[in-house]
């Protein structure tokens, strides 16, 4: 199993993530609606919005998975935040990086995985939108375009929420 490396900007990325004050927060109805829609559009077992903390990936929204987090060192999403594009594994059992990963050999029995980074306004990869299934497959070009659209919706929402909180803090300090 290949453990994900740390991004070169890891300290700044974590600082940016923590500034969003989104880790370990209550479920968000809007984000849950988006992941539920994605689950139906892509016909996959699991859809997650995963935020990559120092030693774990925490799921802000999840469809088809009971766990609220998993260790970062076995995460697929930890690999995604190292790049800026779609990361797709058509069959994890056939990929040497993941074939013996406990998320492949045990529950949730990942075979298909695709993730795309979710960025902050500063450009940090905070986490991912990912699709998971228990059988091999490959996204079509149309599905890849839809995945980018879903990511953009989520990313814009997270950025707007953060900017609204920042604005409110400024307004509160003025009054």
What does each of the following model-derived ranges do?
Residues 139-156:
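Amphipathic alpha-helical "output/dimerization" segments
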Residues 111-120:
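A short, aliphatic-rich beta-strand micro-motif
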Residues 125:
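Glycine-rich acetyl-CoA-binding "A-motif" of GNAT/NAT acetyltransferases
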Residues 1-71:
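Intrinsically disordered, low-complexity terminal regulatory regions
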Residues 163-175:
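Signal-transducing coiled-coil/dimerization helices and immediately adjacent hinge/linker segments
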Residues 128-137:
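Short beta-strand-to-loop transition segments that serve as allosteric relay/switch motifs
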Residues 46, 52, 56-62, 67-111:
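Regulatory sensory and allosteric helical modules in signal-transduction proteins
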